[in-house]
């Protein structure tokens, strides 16, 4: 799964919601301030999180001179939308803010990117020090479960988290099904792409 997403490492859990909450639990110890994009899913909700935008402008807190570690929370494709969000605005944040980006790819994994790998691997903004993705596998993959992907250090931290160790894992049969159906997922994604291009020619 990590190879498909093009991440260094990944692990599965019982749901996308749990994936988000576990990732946030680890990041809470490493973050001075959280910021969230509009319409961010509940899986990435933090009570102390500040809005990324105030009005139609960047939150002034993102532009001040305070050196701090911040985590930005967002869906890659928010609910009720069909296009991925534009993350280039993160380049406007000054270098004194050490940025971790946590994205929810529940509505893009299996749909966007090469062969449906999502957009995680395409996020390469110079201002981002660390990027992490979580997703539900119950959308395009049709299997109950969730995934957390990122760099090896972060995933190793996840594996040692007491909450992760004691939580329910993804159904083993579903994990095996996902591996066995790799070729089928690829075929179906190619079919989807072809059908969308066909529809697009008549719109």
What are the roles of these predicted feature ranges?
Residues 13, 23-43, 197:
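Conserved PLP-anchoring active-site segment centered on the Schiff-base-forming lysine
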Residues 123-157, 170:
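Active-site PLP attachment segment
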Residues 80, 108-110:
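Catalytic P-loop NTPase motifs of RecA-like helicase/translocase cores
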Residues 55-103:
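Active-site phosphate-binding strand-loop segment of PLP-dependent enzymes
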Residues 1-22:
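Short loop-beta-helix segment that forms the pyridoxal 5′-phosphate
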Residues 174, 178-203:
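Conserved PLP-dependent catalytic core of the aminotransferase class-I/II
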Residues 144, 161-170, 187:
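A short glycine-threonine-serine/GTX helix/turn-capping micro-motif
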